[in-house]
């Protein structure tokens, strides 16, 4: 059908359990944009919206289901309260649609940018675009326009950002520092591409010289770019296949040469690469994968990455996945976000981001441990905190009046158990268990346990060296926290706080 784009958004009513149908937009006989949606004009579960801003005021051809009736609007309609019932209270979610990996993380001009894998047309994976949001503090987010649209070359898979302050790529226009976004174009071939912004991240333009890297093996993806200041070079971490990863080098961010390939046991896809200075003053490089297996290493005289110890593990569940650090700049905290894979049942949106974490490196008993703690900004969310520091307890209970809460323990005494929103957590001599997840304890005498709960997931941090995210839909009838120990437990720190934005 011919379609005059009279307003920005085209309504797409969808049935969650429906069959996907193909929509293809063409101009002058050439397909330019396509997506799949479970189109259901009768009794849809939710409405989604095709953003056709690039075609406003023009006539295009739309190949759509035979019974499709085009309806335009100026803006998406707000969701009904019932549709938002399970929206996490303090964790990032898309307004609509599925999200997964965090992408293009950077801090620029006082704002944290979060780009993310996004399906604008349903609550399940597909149609990979890059969504976009900005925040002054990593908790209060403002949704921005869809940043990268899938095209006829492929979907927009994961990638990273660079704040190109020295204009190494030569893409600066005007006074703004260019922001560079590396991503995988996933179509018939999987190639590494570049988009850039010269207006502070508001608009992304696909680079005319794409791809930067051709397909080397099928499915190679997820470029993460960082500057190696000591050797004055740019590095790109890339996933190849199986458990095989690599590193490329460049001087101009446009032309890349393979430096090396190696295996990361127990992991696949979504590499991250960044330096950290340990608590003993030694600066080392972290190379990690989507499952949070990680190497601690350094570069040798030939410039090759060499792990200095056996592979480590930070995350002990598959619910916290595909973590990425914000673009590294010396002297600033190393902050990362991970995708929380916990389902949000029945909502027009699905998936969230884990609590933003600050990354550190600690030498414990001669081994380096990658550590993650919630960023300090979580303190600004605390409401109605109960403190029982320095007390000895066997039993404790209190109601919880908010959707989100934080519980923090510090103790040398174990074991004990607790229940939060109906979820059982056991603190034992060897570590912390919750559901199928077990977080092992290091050699440290004191156990520091931090628990962050929201509507559909609970995160647990043990001494920073082991973390997990456990899917758990809150039961409103169990909106409480309780603790029980067979023998008295002395708590150097014991705090229960409700959280809210």
Model-predicted segments: where are they?
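Structural motif
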Residues: 21-22, 125-129, 189-194, 243-247, ...
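Beta-rich accessory regions
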Residues: 1-34, 49-68, 76-78, 290, ...
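Hydrophobic alpha-helical membrane-insertion signals
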Residues: 18, 23, 53-55, 65, ...
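An acidic-aromatic loop/edge-strand motif
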Residues: 70-81, 185, 190-194, 198, ...
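Beta-propeller domains
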Residues: 20-22, 26-29, 93, 109-110, ...
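Surface loop/turn signatures of beta-propeller and other carbohydrate-active proteins
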Residues: 2, 31-51, 69-103, 122-125, ...
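Conserved Ser/Thr-centered positions that define the repeating blades of beta-propeller domains
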Residues: 26, 135, 197-198, 247-250
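Hydrophobic core segments of beta-strands in well-ordered, beta-rich domains
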Residues: 12, 62-63, 101-121, 143-147, ...
């Amino acid at each position: 059908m011919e379609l005059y784009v009279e307003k920005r958004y085209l309504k797409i009513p969808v049935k969650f359990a429906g069959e996907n149908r193909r929509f293809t937009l063409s101009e002058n006989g050439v397909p330019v944009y396509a997506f799949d949606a479970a189109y259901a004009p009768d009794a849809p579960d939710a409405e989604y919206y095709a953003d056709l801003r690039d075609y406003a005021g023009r006539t295009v051809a739309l190949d759509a289901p035979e019974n499709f009736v085009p309806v335009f609007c100026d803006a998406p309609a707000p969701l009904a309260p019932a549709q938002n019932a399970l929206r996490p209270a303090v964790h990032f979610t898309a307004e609509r649609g599925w999200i997964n990996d965090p992408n293009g993380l950077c801090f620029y001009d006082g704002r944290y940018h979060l780009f993310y894998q996004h399906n604008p047309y349903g609550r399940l994976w597909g149609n990979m675009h890059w969504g976009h949001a900005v925040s002054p503090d990593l908790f209060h987010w403002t949704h921005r326009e869809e940043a990268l649209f899938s095209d006829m070359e492929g979907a927009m898979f994961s990638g990273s950002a660079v704040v190109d302050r020295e204009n190494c790529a030569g893409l600066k226009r005007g006074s703004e520092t260019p922001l560079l976004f590396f991503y995988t174009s996933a179509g018939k071939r999987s190639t590494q591409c570049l988009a850039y912004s010269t207006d502070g991240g508001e608009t992304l333009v696909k680079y005319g010289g794409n791809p930067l890297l051709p397909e080397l093996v099928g499915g190679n993806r997820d470029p993460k770019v960082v500057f190696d200041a000591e050797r004055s070079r740019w590095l790109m971490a890339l996933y190849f296949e199986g458990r095989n990863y690599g590193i490329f080098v460049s001087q101009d961010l446009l032309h890349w040469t393979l430096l090396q390939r190696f295996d990361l046991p127990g992991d696949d896809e979504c590499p991250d690469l960044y330096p950290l200075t340990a608590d003993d003053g030694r600066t080392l490089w972290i190379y990690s994968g989507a499952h949070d297996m990680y190497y601690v290493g350094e570069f040798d005289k030939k410039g090759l990455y060499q792990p200095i110890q056996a592979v480590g593990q930070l995350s002990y569940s598959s619910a916290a996945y595909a973590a990425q650090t914000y673009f590294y700049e010396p002297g600033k905290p190393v902050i990362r976000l991970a995708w929380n894979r916990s389902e949000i049942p029945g909502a027009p949106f699905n998936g969230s981001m884990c609590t933003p974490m600050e990354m550190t490196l600690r030498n414990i008993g001669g081994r380096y441990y990658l550590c993650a703690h919630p960023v300090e900004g979580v303190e600004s969310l605390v409401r109605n905190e109960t403190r029982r520091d320095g007390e000895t307890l066997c039993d404790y209970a209190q109601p919880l009046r908010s959707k989100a809460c934080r519980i923090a323990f510090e103790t040398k005494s174990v074991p004990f158990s607790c229940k939060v929103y109906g979820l059982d957590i056991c603190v034992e001599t060897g570590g912390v268990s919750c559901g199928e997840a077990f977080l092992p304890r290091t050699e440290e005498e004191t156990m520091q346990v931090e628990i962050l709960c929201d509507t559909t997931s609970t995160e647990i941090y043990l001494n920073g060296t082991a973390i997990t995210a456990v899917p758990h839909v809150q039961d409103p009838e169990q909106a409480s926290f309780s603790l029980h120990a067979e023998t008295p437990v002395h708590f150097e720190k014991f705090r229960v706080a409700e959280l809210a934005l």
